[in-house]
Amino acid sequence: MVRLKEKDGGVVFFVKAQPRSSRSAIIGEYDGKIKISLKAAPVDDAANVECCRFLAKSLGVASSRVRILSGHSSRIKRLTIDGMGAAEAATLFGEHLESVEFDL
């Protein structure tokens, strides 16, 4: 079950990133986190930038609203989407993750 928490006018969640993949995609749930594959390598912040841009594009929000709060040098990252509630985020992620439950 993926946990989404509302904090400071946005929604906070954890992502497990898999860099150097053949394509960028939202894969599913991994240990309470949203698992995504990223085409970019984890060099010079490229994977972090792609992580934010890819999630923004996939969820239909501006890339400036998606930020990494912690985990810049780790595969486990804590992200926020500004101006979005947990219920809205669960709905948007649910379009990509059919069998995943969300803890709001």
UniProtKB/Swiss-Prot annotation:
<protein>
    <recommendedName>
        <fullName>UPF0235 protein Paes_1868</fullName>
    </recommendedName>
</protein>
<dbReference type="GO" id="GO:0005737">
    <property type="term" value="C:cytoplasm"/>
</dbReference>
<dbReference type="Pfam" id="PF02594">
    <property type="entry name" value="DUF167"/>
</dbReference>
<comment type="similarity">
    <text>Belongs to the UPF0235 family.</text>
</comment>
<dbReference type="InterPro" id="IPR036591">
    <property type="entry name" value="YggU-like_sf"/>
</dbReference>
<dbReference type="InterPro" id="IPR003746">
    <property type="entry name" value="DUF167"/>
</dbReference>
